[in-house]
């Protein structure tokens, strides 16, 4: 169970994940890729009712380590089916001429990434799931008004696809925490994926903690080779 102090930290981080896209555009967050690169880009996929602002610190930290980052603009994940979001991701990557990539998805973003990897297996070299509800989240019931959230209510037929062997060859990693107040450990586990435990961190803290950066560094260590 998450502590009261952890919940306070999560509440304080929440606004950092909600900066509107127009402001991110003004800040120059979405810079166009300059020509071809020998590096495989790391594509960051945000979660439900969030924007790419939650990834800005992690993006900066990873760029300092030499990784090439791409932030697709997929919307708020509220009134669209996750299958539609995966197709939108495919269109974004095609538009940006990204033929191969590493996908890192937080929460619902990881579900979107899984579907993309399933549909485009030759395009994904690694899939990294950061607090992803592969078996759903009990809190999804609170957001019953959302088409996206309803797909993530435990027991929804949509979630059956995550029960069997992963339908792609890319290596998969599931990063999770026992103190994640949104995604229980049992839901974050993915068959065929290597489990990485970062206990003590909340759902949003997974985006901001230096421990996450260290874990990602180990996972991504050879992605440019």
Spans of model-derived segments:
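Short active-site-adjacent structural elements
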Residues: 182-185, 205
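Catalytic histidine neighborhood in serine/cysteine hydrolases
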Residues: 70, 191-205, 216
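Catalytic histidine-centered segment of alpha/beta-hydrolase-like enzymes
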Residues: 80-81, 202-210
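Serine-dependent carboxylesterase/thioesterase catalytic core
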Residues: 42-53, 57, 61-171, 182-183
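Flexible, membrane-associating and regulatory peripheral segments of lipid-active enzymes
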Residues: 1-42, 51, 55-72, 95-98, ...
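Short beta-strand/loop motif that positions the catalytic acidic residue
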Residues: 174-176, 180
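A hydrolase-biased, glycine/serine/histidine/acidic-enriched motif that marks catalytic-domain neighborhoods
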Residues: 155, 160-161, 175, 198, ...
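Post-His helix in hydrolase/transferase enzymes
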Residues: 207-221
């Amino acid at each position: 169970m998450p502590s009261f102090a952890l919940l306070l930290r999560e509440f304080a981080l929440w606004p950092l994940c909600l900066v509107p896209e127009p402001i991110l555009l003004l800040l120059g967050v979405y810079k166009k890729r300059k020509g071809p690169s020998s590096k495989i880009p790391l594509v960051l996929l945000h979660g439900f009712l969030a924007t790419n602002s939650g990834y800005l610190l992690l993006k900066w930290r990873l760029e300092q380590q030499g990784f090439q980052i791409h932030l697709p603009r997929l919307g708020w994940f509220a009134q669209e089916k996750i299958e539609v979001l995966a197709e939108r991701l495919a269109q974004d990557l095609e538009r940006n001429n990204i033929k191969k990539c590493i996908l890192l998805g937080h929460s619902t973003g990881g579900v979107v990434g899984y579907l993309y990897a399933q549909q485009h297996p030759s395009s994904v070299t690694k899939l990294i799931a950061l607090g992803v509800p592969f078996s759903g989240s009990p809190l999804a019931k609170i957001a019953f008004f959302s088409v996206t959230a309803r797909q993530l209510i435990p027991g929804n037929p949509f979630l059956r696809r995550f029960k069997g062997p992963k339908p792609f060859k890319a290596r998969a990693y599931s990063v999770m925490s026992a103190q994640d107040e949104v995604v229980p450990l049992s839901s974050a586990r993915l068959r065929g994926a290597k489990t990485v435990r970062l206990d003590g961190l909340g759902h949003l803290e997974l985006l901001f903690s230096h421990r996450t950066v260290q874990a990602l560094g180990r996972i991504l260590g050879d992605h440019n080779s």
